[in-house]
Amino acid sequence: MLSRLFRMHGLFVASHPWEVIVGTVTLTICMMSMNMFTGNNKICGWNYECPKLEEDVLSSDIIILTITRCIAILYIYFQFQNLRQLGSKYILGIAGLFTIFSSFVFSTVVIHFLDKELTGLNEALPFFLLLVDLSRASALAKFALSSNSQDEVRENIARGMAILGPTFTLDALVECLVIGVGTMSGVRQLEIMCCFGCMSVLANYFVFMTFFPACVSLVLELSRESREGRPIWQLSHFARVLEEEENKPNPVTQRVKMIMSLGLVLVHAHSRWIADPSPQNSTADNSKVSLGLDENVSKRIEPSVSLWQFYLSKMISMDIEQVITLSLALLLAVKYIFFEQAETESTLSLKNPITSPVVTQKKITDDCCRRDPVLVRNDQKFHAMEEETRKNRERKVEVIKPLLAENDTSHRATFVVGNSSLLGTSLELETQEPEMELPVEPRPNEECLQILENAEKGAKFLSDAEIIQLVNAKHIPAYKLETLMETHERGVSIRRQLLSKKLPEPSSLQYLPYRDYNYSLVMGACCENVIGYMPIPVGVAGPLCLDGKEFQVPMATTEGCLVASTNRGCRAIGLGGGASSRVLADGMTRGPVVRFPRACDSAEVKAWLETPEGFTVIKEAFDSTSRFARLQKLHMSVAGRNLYIRFQSRSGDAMGMNMISKGTEKALSKLQEYFPEMQILAVSGNYCTDKKPAAINWIEGRGKSVVCEAVIPAKVVREVLKTTTEAMIEVNINKNLVGSAMAGSIGGYNAHAANIVTAIYIACGQDAAQNVGSSNCITLMEASGPTNEDLYISCTMPSIEIGTVGGGTNLLPQQACLQMLGVQGACRDNPGENARQLARIVCGTVMAGELSLMAALAAGHLVRSHMIHNRSKINLQDLQGTCTKKAA
């Protein structure tokens, strides 16, 4: 409960840094300026003579006071020296702010406590510095510095406060109670010191709980913004800080502190309120007397100088002990700033040597057994070591080890800094995990089945060879390998081994990666019989200025010039003031086919469905299947006894095929209750139409129907697109309109909309096959402007089938691309808005691609650019294909 309160407090402070900082500073200034608590304005030496104070000062032990000040300065110096070993300038700066502001707050409290008498600070500040503890402040700063984003900074500060807050609160309470015992001693000088100590602890606690976390959050936020959103504070050796700080304090120690606190509270209560005050501690009952400010012995005098001149003269006139203290502080400051920086950097470089180029770790083999990681620097060494490893495996009898340990460590990022010897040591430490030794020869199937079915053992106690043996014997279905293995990756690895033996070239899968992939998001959602994943280059085009916003559009493609061309179109649109877009319609469709005994029956059912009563019945059944699916309309056609019903419904942020299919099935069941003679032939009767060219999608629309437009100034057409408005309009008419009509195209009145649609679909986890209908587009160009030299362009796409949840959008790389566009996941405030926004981005990017390609065609640059940028430089004669090998 207490940790939760501190967590909420930390999150609030980190989320509102400006408010907390301004409020804290304002409160401090008010404490300095207000005069309600101390009614008298007596200042010793200026308007009052304080003979007792002067006598005490003259009789005080100057040597001890000087030593105390020097020790305090050395203590702060060593604390900052320890912070420098962390290697982060941000921790140093934040700790400095913490110290300065804590001193400021403490000075304010002391001034008020002494009735605005600044001479008390001379003895107070050393005790404050001795009680300053930067360890917790630096620990909280390290929590924040281990973050990757500003949101994570706030969350980590909240976690740090939840962990450190209760401990720090208890420690501050215990310190105040322990030090406060000295205020009851009756010794005036000890009472003053203990009073200063208590105020020091309280000031430190106040700053740590308010100003400091807000300052940390604000500093890191400003640092992030100064580098275009990239976190510049994160250090590699902070990666483990959360694990280290998560260790809770010793509960025994905490209980002892609590018991001590209760005991000290009783002591204070008894001494201050229950016991009779004795003459020896009567000074403790009167703060004025205990602090040597007895007004009975003070005499008022007329000031000879102004107050600021009085304070200035006291600051300039320094005693010998003050000169010693100031000299030591300046000497340590110079040493810390100028002479220790190189030494610290040298020490850090020895701890974390960085060499360039960085050695990378490659996985070599694709066999069933674990093998030590091999470090390679070039392909020649890679193949030589691979061949040697294969020969050694043939000659030697090895102990087969399952992939469990490797898979457990494979998901942790391995950062290699330093030389290869250090790397080898780190790899050995990582791989030293408990492993069971398995026999080289496969055991009988019966024994293997018993181990597999044993809940305490399972597949991790079987070698890959034994698993393959069970698959070949039909005891394990090949499609269930991932679910039966201890890790999905091992199941994929075994399937690759099974498949490699059946391929014309056993090493065919060598360059198809499969490691370090989150297959849990794939199984049962995206793919079956997985043997790896296909890396595709992802480029970015942008910024695309659309509806007053800028988007960096990810495009996954292997076609050269595509991203560059689209990027040029985005630049032209941006220079023209940006594009505007609107969503005309939003509705996914599913078109089942049902059959009736006679054609007249089909016609009658069609007529009934067109009535408000019939539509209401079907809509209620359809809408009951989902909180997002809402039937909009029915479009029907009769072909003999067959009735084709096209259901159109919104689907939120999902593309919606599964959602609409579920609603369609429920609606057909309801329709069958009214017409029992109806026969459901198929939930999909190709009347949708999905993944096939269809005029109904072009005319009626499917998914999101979007229109996008822009005006490109004549200067941009000439200087960026390298052509003229007249030439582009002429090419557009004769190519995109007349040419497509001559070819009998359906929805293909564009230059290459499918290129952009498919590239974005692959990058953002969409169904790539739906580029067939989604690429329906008509591109229109007109002359505009006062002189008709500007270019007006529009793209209308009536059937963009797209979504931001479900399917491939659940995969992390695809989610990253969606996050680039700000449309990842479902929109909570307005369901479906993310998908509609993505459709507008697709249409706007298509228009950019159309603009650039049409300009290249008009200027005659297309062939030349592709010859330069889209031609492979590999000598194909040096590559032997499968047919060549067979012929040889």
Curated annotation (Swiss-Prot):
One Pfam entry name: Sterol-sensing
Motif (INSIG-binding motif): 75-78
The keyword ATP-binding appears for this protein: no
Compartments it resides in: Endoplasmic reticulum membrane; Peroxisome membrane
Membrane topology, record value: Multi-pass membrane protein
Substrates-to-products reaction catalysed: (R)-mevalonate + 2 NADP(+) + CoA = (3S)-3-hydroxy-3-methylglutaryl-CoA + 2 NADPH + 2 H(+)
GO molecular function, one term: NADPH binding
Modification sites for Phosphoserine: S872
All ranges on the Lumenal side of the membrane: 40-56, 115-123, 188-191, 276-314
Residues the record marks as carrying a glycan: N281, N296
Membrane-side (Cytoplasmic) residue stretches: 1-9, 79-89, 150-159, 221-248, 340-888
Subunit structure: Homotetramer. Homodimer. Interacts (via its SSD) with INSIG1; the interaction, accelerated by sterols, leads to the recruitment of HMGCR to AMFR/gp78 for its ubiquitination by the sterol-mediated ERAD pathway. Interacts with UBIAD1.
Family: Belongs to the HMG-CoA reductase family.
Name of the molecule in the record: 3-hydroxy-3-methylglutaryl-coenzyme A reductase
Species this protein is from: Bos taurus (Bovine)
